[in-house]
Design a protein with these regions (language model features):
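Pre-Walker A adenine-sensing motif
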Residues: 1-7
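Pre-Walker A (Motif I) flank of P-loop NTPase domains
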Residues: 7-14, 74-76
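Conserved substrate/cofactor phosphate-moiety recognition/catalytic segment
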Residues: 26-76
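NTP-dependent small-molecule kinase module
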Residues: 149-198
Length: 198
């Protein structure tokens, strides 16, 4: 095949998701070495000066969505980080897939909101950004519910990892759109389904 006869490689969108404190930013560095375009609302918020934290978060959310829309229009590969606590990405994911993107979801799970709160507190003591405890707890539950009810059904591939041990994440389960679920950790997977799918 000549270069012009070769099939076009579809653009890729990778979503690194999980509760606050789950290690999304840390894992992103290892997982996304090939992605030049990595969009992170927390990093955008840190760059916004002259605003309250709430004002910076709102501005960062707007800029985050603008950046990913620009990249999608340009059909560039990109990766983003999110808690999945809202359904704000759902329509975009459907549109990206309609536009020829392959969308991959990696979810970093923690077994409790308490652990998420502890990890964020540790991050703050180490100089990282803070998130109010009530927000961490709300996002923890909402993100897991949305993972199962909204996001797994609309992406091309997905993987859920246990990232509670502080070392390498442990694969719990994975799948492809409309395909079978491959379960690596049956007890953890069963617990997630019972808690967030019923």
């Amino acid at each position: 095949l000549s270069e012009q006869d070769a099939p076009e490689v579809p653009p890729q969108a990778v979503i690194i998701a999980g509760p606050n404190g789950s290690g999304k930013s840390t894992c992103s560095v290892a997982l996304l070495t090939q992605f030049v375009e990595f969009v992170n609302a927390d990093l955008i918020a840190q760059e916004i000066t002259g605003h309250t934290r709430a004002g910076a978060d709102i501005g960062a959310g707007r800029l985050f969505l603008e950046q990913i829309e620009r990249l999608a229009r340009q059909r560039r590969d990109f990766a983003i980080e999110t808690t999945l606590a809202t359904r704000s990405l759902a329509d975009r994911i459907v549109q990206w897939r309609r536009d020829g993107y392959r969308v991959h979801l990696v979810f970093l799970w923690l077994p409790s909101a308490d652990l998420a709160v502890q990890r964020v507190a540790f991050r703050v003591r180490s100089g990282g950004h803070s998130v109010p405890e009530s927000t961490i707890r709300r996002r923890f539950t909402a993100g897991l519910r949305n993972l199962f009810r909204i996001y797994i059904p609309i992406v091309d591939t997905w993987r859920v990892y246990d990232n509670s041990r502080g070392a390498d994440p442990v694969l719990i389960a994975s799948g492809v759109k409309d395909g079978p679920v491959k379960i690596a950790e049956p007890d953890a997977w069963r617990g997630l389904l019972q808690e967030y799918c019923s």
